[in-house]
Structure formats: structure tokens, C-alpha cells
């Protein structure tokens, strides 16, 4: 490695076990060259996978696709040689192998672009490719914050619940990036349980690349991001309820049980936060209503909200 404007170069070497060694070196140009030596394969570990061209591309796409600097690699391709002119009657196409320097990473992540620069179709395609869904999301939430917590977030409310959503196998969490580098594929600490259906990505400049899961749980920045996202998701769902009632009622059919569970759990600690998102079937109105809509139509002498509980609407009705 040689700094710009310096006459000295240094070689840093480590076996990856304990410590490192630095010695003077010879280098004509400024910059850093990194050489990695792969361990020999063992019966259980196949390190040569890291030397496979497609394996390297996959690793870069997974962990460093959104690093803002280009990650380039020489790749070999085949192409047809130019046809001779004039072309003989017995001419057969010939092919040649050539090497091309390719940039492997996207560099500019979609969540760092202004919402006005991205179409609904581009958001939908990114969501379906990233999270393996076959339908467009019901809601796209873009959040950017600078100040006490610096982060970019791109969140999606799915149109339907995953097949395992109400099972113990379902894992909540958002993909967590630190300055464009993937740190954790599913960070559960970014979402409260009652919003566990939300999928998406959070990219923060305030997190260390080598932060552990245990350190994340104690990280104050993560708690600030959690609180900000919780408020943002709640506001977006409330906006959907107010401005697109039909879509919200479709959302409620898929995830309403989770919202109700959130209002009920922890001794009702979150009931105040979630009450405006709740929907109930009104026998009188013959449609879904919010608590506020019910209260607005109560007779002046009525003091309480009346309800009937049961396994189904029909079983809850009292026939006179």
C-alpha cells in the first residue's frame, strides 16, 4: 500500500490467526493491492468455491451490491468472429474467447434514490425479486432520516400473508445494511411484532460493518431506527385506511389478526397506538368500521361500545 504523494510503501501481512506484520515494500504507484490466499480444501470445507467465477459474482451481489465504489472483475465470454467479405459458400461461423472488465455491483441502491426517480413498476419488480413474492406490494414506504439516527429505509407491505406467517417457522426482520454492505439478512430488532409482516431494507451510515448480533441488541442507534420505523409504518397504514379504504380492508383480511394481537398483547401496552388501525364488523352497518366511526354514530345517551364475541359473525348474532 502506498499513499498518494508518499515515497514509502508498506506491506501488511496476516495469517488470520493472531496479529499481523508490517514491513517496508516497493510500489511504483499510489493505492492498495490486496492479495488473498485461499486455504486448502478439507473433507468438510470446500474453500475453492471462493475461486469460482460465478461464486465470486454471487458473493459480491449478496453482500456488496450497493457499495458506492465499483467492484470489477475480468470475465471471459464468447463471441462470433466477424464474417469475411466476401463470404465463402462453405463458410462456417467461428467463435472466439475474449476477456472483458465487468462491474459486478449496482453501486446506487434503489432506496437511496428519490421516490420521484423510481416508478411504481421498478419498486414492485425490486420487491418481487428481492423477497421472492409473485404479487405487487400493497404499499411502498420510503423513509430517510438525518440527525440523531442516519438511515435510509425502503419498506413494503405485502398484498398477502406468507403461507407460514402464523406459524413458528416465520422469521420477521428487515435486511440491515451498513453503508451499503449487508450486515444481517433479517434483523428482527427493527420491527415490533405487530408489524412483523413488513418486509424491506434499512441502510445506516452509523453502524459498524463488524457489529455482532449481541451488540446490535444494545445499540442505541438501532433503537432509534426501530422507533422511527414503527411510527412511519403506523402513519402509512393509517393513510391507507383514510385514503384507500378498499385496499386497507384487503390488507386487514390478510394481517388484521396480527394488529389485533398487538393491541391485546403485553397487557394492552400498545392498544393506544394501534386502536385507530382496528376494524370490526358492524351488524347494523353491514360493513367493517373503525372504533371512531362506531363512536361517531352512537346515540347521545349511549356511553359504551357494545360488542358480541364468537367464533364467527353468524354465531355472534342474537336472533330474536
Regions found by a protein language model. Give the residues of each.
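Conserved GHKL (Bergerat-fold) ATPase module
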Residues: 1-318
Amino acid at each position: 500500500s502506498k499513499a498518494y504523494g508518499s515515497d514509502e510503501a508498506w506491506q501488511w501481512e496476516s495469517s488470520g490467526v493472531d496479529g499481523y506484520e508490517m514491513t517496508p515494500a516497493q510500489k511504483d504507484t499510489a493505492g492498495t493491492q490486496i492479495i488473498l490466499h485461499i486455504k486448502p480444501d478439507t473433507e468438510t470445507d470446500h474453500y475453492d468455491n471462493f475461486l469460482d467465477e460465478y461464486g465470486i459474482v454471487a458473493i459480491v451481489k449478496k453482500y456488496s451490491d450497493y457499495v458506492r465504489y465499483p467492484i470489477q472483475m475480468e470475465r471471459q465470454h464468447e463471441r462470433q468472429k466477424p464474417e469475411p467479405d466476401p463470404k465463402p459458400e462453405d463458410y462456417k461461423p467461428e467463435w472466439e474467447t475474449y476477456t472483458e472488465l465487468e462491474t459486478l455491483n449496482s453501486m446506487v441502491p434503489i432506496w437511496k434514490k428519490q421516490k420521484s426517480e423510481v416508478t411504481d413498476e421498478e419498486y414492485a419488480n425490486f420487491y418481487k425479486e428481492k423477497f421472492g413474492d409473485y404479487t405487487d406490494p400493497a404499499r411502498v414506504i420510503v423513509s430517510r432520516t438525518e440527525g440523531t439516527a442516519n438511515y435510509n429505509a425502503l419498506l413494503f407491505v405485502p398484498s398477502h400473508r406468507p403461507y407460514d406467517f402464523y406459524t413458528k417457522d416465520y422469521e420477521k426482520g428487515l435486511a440491515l445494511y451498513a453503508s451499503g454492505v449487508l450486515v444481517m439478512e433479517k434483523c428482527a430488532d427493527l420491527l415490533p411484532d405487530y408489524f412483523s409482516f413488513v418486509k424491506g431494507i434499512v441502510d445506516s451510515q452509523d453502524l459498524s460493518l463488524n457489529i455482532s448480533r449481541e451488540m446490535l441488541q444494545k445499540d442505541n442507534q438501532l433503537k432509534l431506527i426501530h422507533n422511527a420505523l414503527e411510527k412511519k409504518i403506523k402513519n402509512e397504514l393509517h393513510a391507507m385506511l383514510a385514503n384507500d379504504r378498499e385496499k386497507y380492508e384487503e390488507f386487514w383480511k390478510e394481517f388484521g389478526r396480527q394488529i389485533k394481537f398487538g393491541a391485546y398483547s403485553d397487557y394492552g401496552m400498545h392498544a393506544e397506538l394501534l386502536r385507530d388501525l382496528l376494524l370490526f364488523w358492524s351488524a347494523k352497518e353491514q360493513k367493517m368500521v373503525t372504533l371512531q366511526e362506531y363512536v361517531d354514530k352512537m346515540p347521545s345517551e349511549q356511553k359504551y361500545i357494545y360488542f358480541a364475541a364468537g367464533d364467527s359473525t353468524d354465531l355472534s348474532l342474537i336472533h330474536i
